[in-house]
Amino acid sequence: MNHQKERMQMTDASVVSGALSASAEWAAVDWRLVERQVRRLQARIAQAEKTGKAGKVKALQRILAHSFSAKLWATRRVVVNKGRRSPGVDGVLWKTPEEKWIAARSLRARGYRPRPLRRIYIPKKNGKLRPLSIPTMTDRAMQALYLLALNPVAEVRADPNSYGFRPYRSTADALGQCFCVFAKKCSPKVVFDADIKACFDRISHPWLLANVPMDKAILRKWLAAGYVEATVLYPTEEGTPQGGIISPVLANLTLDGLERVAHEAAPGRSLVNVVRYADDFLVTARTPEILNEKVIPAIKTFLAERGLEISEEKSKVTDIETGFDFLGATIRKYDGKLLMTPSRKSVKGFLDSIRGTIKAHAGGAFRELTRLLNPRIRGWANYYRNIVSSRVFTKVDSAIFDAMVRWMRRRHPRKGLSWLRTRYFRSSGHRHWIITAATWKADSSVSYTDLFQASSVPIRRHVKVQAAATAFDPAFRDYFRKLRKTRTQTKAADHTGSFQASAAARRSRQHQPGRVTAASGKA
């Protein structure tokens, strides 16, 4: 009776008001109420899973998956994310409010048949191509809907030190845990840097169907949907499709338990730690023998049960004094002191990409090149802002500066340094040779766009999430509220500092008469 009452509460039209057109209905949705209703039931699912009430978990999941609030929330996720402009095999996109409302109303399990995924290939950093499978909008929304019901269970079951594709967790948290593991004098000396061979493509379908706590009929249809490449339909007999909304959580559920297996293989003072981000993980121990004879064999057995295996070519046992790369960072101890820096591979890949963009923009406007580079430099620097990166940032700035100067000289082979300085540079306080692009406005004023410098990003220690904290557990509600506030304040402080620096730069530029002549045109 209580479940029936909850179903009525979750599926009524309280999130909108009155009898309106489809477009008006979508515009009238109270999204705060929708989110509150969904989050409330997700918390109950997490609590039921935490206390081992499997029957209640299943009943609450069904209520959530059939609720209109969840259908609205799932539809909204699909139409606002960055993949909203990429259609599936049917070529359909939901662009108008009317289409979005009708889509939300049409999401139901009865009679649902997913379409094959559209297979495309995107370039990887190493120049190779990575397959990406794109579901239809309807299939994406259905995955998002059932993910709302699956995620609370996945969070409760998750390994404490799993940091990929989980709420409030990121690579910064994973690297923060690495610091916690290795920074002490009595920290483990030996590391197993592991790589799983084609993890997403090889996960066992029978294992998923037997162990993933969701509607098995729906899951079976997704796994068997296949994909279309060049008008040819290919079956999928293993793996989760890379590109599906629910795929990362399925992969996490597959690998959850690995941390427990590692600890059970070598109990006591073995100094075993596991840090995992999706399918990228490392395991520590006191000696190589503990890893090679106990932990690694146990992990291989664990993975084999799921259709997976360790890549022997890409995995290795090393020590912290030699160092290793993890999530784009080099982690190494020098004379007992732990240093985490951007890896050489990451720095080289980033600079190669920047130089390639500069070279490809040989005939374009300088201001457009600057605007193209700035978000990439800022994003790369922000990724590494939580580790020892200041020296690397300075070197990166120098390399980009040299590449830009070469662009200027190729563009103006007959112009001297004084002319180039007037056209492309400015000074501010003690800083000289700041690369900047000028744009003339309609009122004859000039605006400037400086080339972003990685070294302007302040280095700050990341506030790492507690390993035991799970996002949907009511017991951690206050903790996550404080964590959000702390992280928001840190971002706001950084933004304020950046804004003040920009304002000072603008004031400095106002006192540089005659700095620009025709720099606003195509350089």
Please name every model-derived segment.
Residues 23-83, 148-164:
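Charged boundary/loop elements
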Residues 224, 305-372, 376-380:
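A conserved non-catalytic segment of reverse transcriptases
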Residues 397, 401-403, 408-503:
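Extended C-terminal regions of large enzymes
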Residues 106, 110, 157-169, 173-323:
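Conserved polymerase palm-domain catalytic core
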Residues 1-32, 36, 450, 464-523:
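Intrinsically disordered, low-complexity and often Lys/Arg-enriched segments
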Residues 57-126:
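Phosphate/adenylate-binding "loop-and-lid" substructures adjacent to NTP/NAD/dNTP-binding pockets
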Residues 131, 235-240, 339, 355-369, ...:
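Short, solvent-exposed helix-loop connector elements
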